[in-house]
Curated annotation (Swiss-Prot):
Residues 368-379 have a biased composition (Basic residues). Residues 53-77, 131-156, 301-321, 368-389 are annotated as: Disordered. This is Protein twist. It comes from Drosophila virilis (Fruit fly). CDD domains: bHLH_TS_TWIST. InterPro entries: bHLH_dom, E-box_TF_Regulators, HLH_DNA-bd_sf, Twist-rel_bHLH. SUPFAM superfamilies: HLH, helix-loop-helix DNA-binding domain (SSF47459). Pfam families: HLH.
Length: 519
């Protein structure tokens, strides 16, 4: 069997629990080890914080009150108790507020905080020391005049400061600080009352700072803000130290249930900061009250909701939307929360005059109605384009029909006029050829009439001489006339077939073209 090595047990105490006595004992050594940077020290001297200034002012006020009280009353002071459990007992040393030390912070943060507070604490102790010396001198002069002097005066005279100071200006903590029983360090009941009032004021300020986030952003109605403003304007006596944001006198006091009607739920506004509301009280109060009274009806209709009356069948949804939008914009313009862009976008009919909005109470329940302008319907661009396109289409149809009928007429004319197979005539050439054909027909008719007359004369004579006369007539006549006469004699009627006539016209046409070219 192999022997297992026993591992040593290590106990680690990771809990860091510094106690108050340890830190109090090391505070003097920490101040010696840490050197305050000169730049940081000068910055603290030149730019004190607002809290330090307020604390110094409170200390000066308390010291002045204490000096006045000591001059007026010369009484026997009660001895100082050996221990000071309360923070009010430290007021005799000029320290009205104790520093809250976080004892659960690490060591490096303890060093940094002690170094930062060293400069301020030294300044406070110097001021307190100077004031305390003046108090001791006044007390010594008063006590020398009295016959009986307590034993504590001798100790105070021997040590005018009443306590020892170290090299850094810090008061050294020792048992003598608590055992000294001088008349100057004793507390009167009036002084304790003043200190208690200051502590209560500080507690109220802390509570107000915690509740300010919730109070400032509570949604309230316009009526509630107006009621709070009237209450704020009432004469009240408050001390100068009380904060204006006191929770006991809040600007957002809610009204009773009887005053919160249904029509008020439509007019929610988020309240601004109390400072801005206080500045606008005198300007907005009368306008808001007058505008709200204009929307309320008489005594018999207190519970009547004018906004819900629009839900009836008398008004349409668009009317309700327009009226609600006009009322909301009017409320925002009176309350000072309207935007310039919204006012510019609104039409003058929606805004109206101030008198028309504020004098709406005379209407006794008649809601604000936007007048509708019924204009003539203008044709849209699409309708105009459609009409134009229809007209264009009809014109094109008529043009095609006209062209088609003209082409049909020329085709019929070309069929009547004798043409050659090689002819590719245009419309103008077709018309010219038609005129020439008409001229040819006129000549044929005139020559045929003469030949017919001669033929009739020859028929009355015997056949042989008639035949001889006919042969001489044919020889005398040219080609077309001779053929025409022969045809007429053969048929016995003056009718020429179209084929023969076209052939004759073709021959005549070619002869005319040849003569024209020669010329």
């Amino acid at each position: 069997m192999s022997a297992r090595s026993v591992s040593p047990k290590v106990l680690l105490d990771i809990s860091y629990k510094p106690t108050l006595p340890n830190i109090m004992e090391l505070q003097h050594n920490v101040i010696k080890l840490i050197q305050v940077e000169q730049h940081a020290y000068m910055q603290l001297m030149e730019q004190p914080t607002a809290h330090y200034m307020q604390q110094q002012q409170q200390q000066q006020q308390h010291q002045q009150q204490q000096q006045q009280h000591q001059q007026q009353q010369q009484q026997q002071y009660a001895p100082l108790p050996s221990l000071a459990p309360n923070a009010a007992d430290y007021a005799a040393y000029g320290i009205t507020e104790l520093e809250d030390t976080d004892y659960n912070i690490p060591s490096n943060e303890v060093l940094s905080t002690s170094s930062n507070h060293s400069a301020q604490s030294s300044l406070e102790l110097n001021n307190n020391q100077h004031n305390f010396e003046q108090q001791q001198q006044q007390q010594q002069q008063q006590q020398q005049q009295q016959t009986a002097t307590p034993a504590g005066v001798a100790t105070a005279a021997q040590t005018p400061h009443g306590y020892m100071l170290n090299e850094h200006g810090k008061r050294s903590r020792s048992s003598s600080d608590y055992d000294c029983q001088t008349d100057a360090l004793s507390m009167q009941p009036e002084h304790k009352k003043l200190l208690q009032q200051q502590q209560q004021q500080q507690q109220q300020q802390q509570q107000q700072q915690q509740q300010q986030l919730y109070v400032d952003y509570l949604p309230t109605t316009v009526d509630e803000v107006a009621a709070a403003q009237t209450q704020a304007q009432a004469p009240t006596q408050q001390s100068a130290c009380l904060s204006p944001h006191s929770h006991s006198h809040s600007h957002f006091d809610f009204a009773a249930d009887e005053e919160l009607q249904d029509h008020k739920a439509h007019i929610f506004k988020y309240g601004g900061y109390p400072q801005t509301i206080a500045q606008q009280q005198q300007q907005q109060q009368q306008q808001q009250l007058h505008f709200q009274s204009s929307y309320r009806t008489g005594q018999n209709y207190e519970a009547y909701d004018p906004a819900n009356s629009l839900n009836g069948s008398t008004y349409s949804s668009s009317d309700r939307d327009d009226m609600e939008y006009a009322r909301q914009t009017a409320l925002s313009s009176v309350g000072g929360y309207a935007k310039e862009d919204e006012l510019e976008d609104m039409s003058p009919t929606c805004l109206g005059d101030d008198s028309s909005l504020l004098d709406a109470g005379d209407a006794a329940g008649k809601a604000f109605r936007k007048p509708r302008r019924r204009l003539k319907r203008k044709p849209s661009k699409t309708e105009e384009t459609d009409e134009f396109s229809n007209q264009r289409v009809m014109a094109n149809v008529r043009e095609r029909q006209r062209t088609q009928s003209l082409n049909d007429a020329f085709k019929a004319l070309q069929q009547i006029i004798p043409t050659l197979p090689s002819d590719k005539l245009s419309k103008i050439q077709t018309l010219k050829l038609a005129t020439r054909y008409i001229d040819f027909l006129c000549r044929m008719l005139s020559s045929s009439d003469i030949s017919l007359l001669k033929a009739l004369e020859a028929q009355s004579s015997p056949v042989s001489p008639g035949y001889g006369n006919a042969s001489t007539l044919l020889s005398a006549a040219n080609g077309a006339e001779a053929d025409l006469k022969c045809l007429r004699k053969a048929n016995g009627a003056p009718i020429i077939p179209p084929e023969k006539l076209s052939y004759l016209f073709g021959v005549w046409r070619m002869e005319g073209d040849a003569q024209h070219q020669k010329a």
